[in-house]
Amino acid sequence: MAKPSAPVLFFNSLSKKIENFTPIDPERVRLYSCGPTVYNFAHLGNLRAYVFTDSLRRMLNWKGYPVNHVINITDVGHLTSDSDTGDDKMEAAAHKAQKTIWDVARFYTEAFWSDLKNLNIFNPTIWSIATDHIEDMIAFARKIEEAGFTYQLDSGLYFDTSRLKEYGLLAGHREAEGVGRIETVAGKKHPADFALWRRSSPDEKRQMEWISPWGPGAPGWHLECSVMSMKYLGEQFDIHTGGIDHREIHHCNEIAQNQAFTGDQQKTGANFWLHNNFLVDRSGKMSKSKGSFLTLSTLIEAGIHPLAYRVLCLSAHYRSELEFSPDNILAALTRLKRLVIAVGQLKKKVQKKVVADGEPDWLRAFDERSFSKGAPLDYQRGLIEAPLKKEALAILERFDQAVSNDLMLPQALPLLEETLGNKKLQPEEQLRLIASMDMILGLNLLHLDRASLNIRPKNASLQENNVLALLEERQLKRKEKDFAASDAIRNRLSEAGIDVLDGDPLGWEWRPEWNA
């Protein structure tokens, strides 16, 4: 199957403009994404970055490009300040929990992976763990030192940013936005200089430290991403993603390290640097530093399916701020439910035409996840789209144009909804279009059902068996025409957060309880 015709366009933070995307290797896109520092749970703002990156990867796969995707796990070196001050976040978390750093890292890494699974986010090709690459980091820093880009202080080995004429490309050389918010470390030649290796002080008791040419200590946070991206993707790869808060300091420092290591000012690490914007609430940017933040578990405990958060993310462009509020997440849940109901009804219409086992051959053969594991896209998309006619192909072309234009997913999701209501299409055409579109949107619409969206809130006063018993009693009262008793049971269920759905196949559902 030929690739869709729309060219892929991205806003490149490096050039500050929209550019045509052409991979370095036409056979494979190389993509690196900054991963979490695993000292705490990922909050919803953190997770927005991975919904964005997953959508990006899905779109590239859908367009015909296999993707070699690397995400790092930072389990050492990230200080409470993005510069070189404060405590190591991992050391501080371990001390507070009275556990080893390894135990803390393992716990929060597994929690993060669980969040990604709940959001239907694909695993990368490689999970790159920082502490597995310490020797690589030492060798990388040593080469930069030999090239004359460093100096030593009592606190460690520092990168001399004055050696690079174009330092701060991503920040546009705007000190007010980048350098201006870096705290000063005594002895640094310039405020923007940063640690490649932080030497342990003699009176410091650290759980994690390694022997190096600069004394025992730990790598700087910025060093980790340069080393791991280059190791797995090469000196210059296609795309680097991360949150917009990384753009002014962390990613500027990555670029500086890459240029110093290669000796080539043109080798910034990636041709395209893509940054997602913040998730905000009434108090501003969602942040762990505020001490109180919302996690995916917060939503699940409120009775909200995690894919409702994915719907919310799809409703705003990745470069725009996204507002989180109770009203917004509940509206996203309602939107998800409507989609699941509509797709379920559509599947029933299509299945009625199939004599064998109620499911079309193409639907049985289609595995939404297999295309991310190297399955040929011409098979996966060809399986779905081959029989589509003019009207359906026109919709698919509009969808292609939206997702190819800097990932305009807020335009793409309404096209899926429009397809569901399009009476000019045959039901099977509609379902085939939904299947193709959802390869990018990632809502698992062909497999979700309403029952899976019916989640009991953690603080609900009744257990499901109590609810079923009361519903059975209510049915009995209705048969006996004791409507007063029937209404009383309905009211009791409503007060307990259960909506009775007479005439609906589901019968009843939990009402989300939002107390955050």
Swiss-Prot record:
Q: Give the reactions, separated by semicolons, that this protein catalyses.
A: tRNA(Cys) + L-cysteine + ATP = L-cysteinyl-tRNA(Cys) + AMP + diphosphate
Q: According to its UniProt record, which protein family does this protein belong to?
A: Belongs to the class-I aminoacyl-tRNA synthetase family.
Which cofactor is recorded for it? Zn(2+)
- Give the lineage: Bacteria, Pseudomonadati, Pseudomonadota, Alphaproteobacteria, Sphingomonadales
Q: Which GO terms describe its biological process?
A: cysteinyl-tRNA aminoacylation
Which UniProt keywords are present, listed alphabetically? Aminoacyl-tRNA synthetase, ATP-binding, Cytoplasm, Ligase, Metal-binding, Nucleotide-binding, Protein biosynthesis, Zinc
**Species:** Zymomonas mobilis subsp. mobilis (strain ATCC 31821 / ZM4 / CP4)
Q: List the disulfide bonds.
A: none
- Gene Ontology CC, one term: cytosol
Query: What is written in the cofactor note of this entry?
Result: Binds 1 zinc ion per subunit.
Q: Do you know which CDD domains this protein is assigned to?
A: CysRS_core (cd00672)
> Where along the sequence does the record place the motif called 'KMSKS' region?
285-289
Subcellular location as annotated: Cytoplasm
What this protein is called in its record is Cysteine--tRNA ligase
